[in-house]
Amino acid sequence: MERMRRARNAVLVFYYVFTACGAVFCLRRDAAVYNLLLALAAFALPAVPFLLYRACRLRPVYLLEIVFDGFVLAAVPFASLFGGYDFVPYWDKILHFLSGFLFAVLGTAVYFSCKPGRRLERGDAFNAALYTWMFAMMSAVLWEIWEYFVSQFGADPQHVLTTGVGDTMQDMIVCTLGGLITAVSCWKYLRHLGEKRRKGLMMSLFEAYYSENIEKRP
């Protein structure tokens, strides 16, 4: 636990140094209000896990924070402030693909939080994996609905003018694929519960959250 806490702190230091450099780079290039808001959002987003801990009375899960900060770093400071979308091919699709993994793990946590007794059992393998996959797909759809809502105010986050529905469909497909891979990992994890097998990052993330905030919950 202490080692993970130190690792989380090191990641946060790197995140804020990287973000500060990205903010300076972005605002010197174009000091538009939109870019200023992006920079402020980049500095604020690492606080999301802490706010969730307080609001939901959860125990800290440092691995969760490390993974979350890594994803946000790739999505906002690197992609938006430094312009990663412009010089890394398919970076947007890579991020949507990775989001499928994260939303799927969240789905696994929701499944066992709602399950009576909240115990991990081999018999849950199929249902939990299916729920995990469906949760990731639902999240992809909701995100595209949000982007459509934003587009009503003049922006074009779905690139409708240049791709039609292509960008929207590709985003949902790659997120669904990431969710499917995590669902298979969830199925294997539960089918071989108790055996000494490699869990992979996503199931390790779920296990860390489960042990702190589901299993120990009264």
Identify the residue ranges that each predicted region occupies.
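Cytoplasmic-side transmembrane-helix entry/capping segments in multi-pass membrane proteins
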Residues: 37-40, 59-71, 93-96
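Interfacial helix-loop-helix junctions of multi-pass membrane proteins
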Residues: 82-83, 87-92, 137-180
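Alpha-helical transmembrane segments of multi-pass membrane proteins
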Residues: 46-50, 71-76, 104, 135-143, ...
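Membrane-interfacial alpha-helical segments at the cytosolic side of multi-pass membrane proteins
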Residues: 99-115, 152-157, 176-189
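Membrane-interface helix caps and helix-loop-helix hairpins in membrane proteins
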Residues: 27-33, 58, 81-91
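N-terminal membrane topogenic signal
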Residues: 1-14
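Membrane-interface helix-boundary motifs at transmembrane edges
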Residues: 2-3, 31-33, 51-64, 118-124
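Short, highly charged, low-complexity non-transmembrane loops/tails of multi-pass membrane proteins
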Residues: 193-218
